Amino acid sequence: MRNSPVSPGPGYAPARGSERARRRGVARWLAYVGGVFAGAWLATQLYYAVQIAMWSVFDPGSSAFMRADAWRLSNAQPATTIRHRWVPYDQIARTLKRAVIASEDADFANNSGYEVDAILQAWEKNRARGRIVSGGSTITQQLARNLFLSGERSYIRKGQELIITWMLETLLDKERIFEIYLNSVEFGCGVYGAQAAAQYYYRIPASRLSAWQSARLAVMLPNPKYFDAHRGSPYLAQRAGVIARRMGAAELPASQ
């Protein structure tokens, strides 16, 4: 008996089968792409973790920020001299250690690398501005950013910064974190680390910095290039006085 004119006809089932096959193909492709991205993300995290674990024994040669900044300066200001010299933790004046903690992260010795209140305040500030203008960063977060990440401001980068911060706090003790920070943080145009800063600004080694010199260096950290070019700024002197008064209460991380 012939098919009725209103019946679906013999091509109906194959069409449905073809649609199911197409959907399965799309699902497999999406799963493959997702797997590639997940694998790349995990490989990146493993790379960061291995690097950090190695730094419990070996000193970092440079940071991502230092390399990017040196490249930028070589193009924009080719006459700039890059200054950086690593020195052991015990060859950095205690006055500078206290000044940096008083200026950047008063609870560094006791926090877990994060200050939740500061992060929430930064979130509210960023939401009000409609863009990222503040990060609420601790010393460990600053180090995470300087060691591995670019200078762009985005929530994705901030998330990666928090993951690296957790790795640093898990794999290194506080004193080692602080030692790496003090040897890699920017103190001026092409000036990285405590030893280079002490020699550049005061012609002395980092071990001989006075309390006032240390306070002056510490207050430069939020905007080192600007304060390098404006060393006579009244704000710089006023803020250094505030830091000098706080230094006595600054708690250094315990030696392990």
Swiss-Prot record:
Pathway(s) annotated for this protein in UniProt: Cell wall biogenesis; peptidoglycan biosynthesis
Catalyzed chemical reaction(s): [GlcNAc-(1->4)-Mur2Ac(oyl-L-Ala-gamma-D-Glu-L-Lys-D-Ala-D-Ala)](n)-di-trans,octa-cis-undecaprenyl diphosphate + beta-D-GlcNAc-(1->4)-Mur2Ac(oyl-L-Ala-gamma-D-Glu-L-Lys-D-Ala-D-Ala)-di-trans,octa-cis-undecaprenyl diphosphate = [GlcNAc-(1->4)-Mur2Ac(oyl-L-Ala-gamma-D-Glu-L-Lys-D-Ala-D-Ala)](n+1)-di-trans,octa-cis-undecaprenyl diphosphate + di-trans,octa-cis-undecaprenyl diphosphate + H(+)
Q: Which InterPro entries match?
A: Glyco_trans_51 (IPR001264), Lysozyme-like_dom_sf (IPR023346), PBP_transglycosylase (IPR036950), Pep_trsgly (IPR011812)
| Alphabetized Gene3D superfamilies for the sequence | Biosynthetic peptidoglycan transglycosylase-like (1.10.3810.10)
Query: How does the protein associate with the membrane?
Result: Single-pass membrane protein
Which terms in the GO cellular component ontology are assigned?
peptidoglycan-based cell wall; plasma membrane
Q: Name one GO molecular function term.
A: peptidoglycan glycosyltransferase activity
Report the record's disulfide bonds. Answer: none
EC number per UniProt: 2.4.99.28
Chief location bin = membrane
Q: Name one GO biological process term.
A: regulation of cell shape
Q: Where, per UniProt, does this protein localize?
A: Cell inner membrane
Which Pfam families does this chain map to? Transgly
Key words of the record = Cell inner membrane, Cell membrane, Cell shape, Cell wall biogenesis/degradation, Glycosyltransferase, Membrane, Peptidoglycan synthesis, Transferase, Transmembrane, Transmembrane helix
* Residues annotated as transmembrane: 26-48
| Protein family according to the UniProt entry | Belongs to the glycosyltransferase 51 family.
Task: Quote the NCBIfam families the UniProt record gives.
Answer: mono_pep_trsgly
Its function, per the record, reads: Peptidoglycan polymerase that catalyzes glycan chain elongation from lipid-linked precursors.
Q: Give the protein name, as stated in the record.
A: Biosynthetic peptidoglycan transglycosylase
Q: Please name the source species.
A: Burkholderia mallei (strain ATCC 23344)
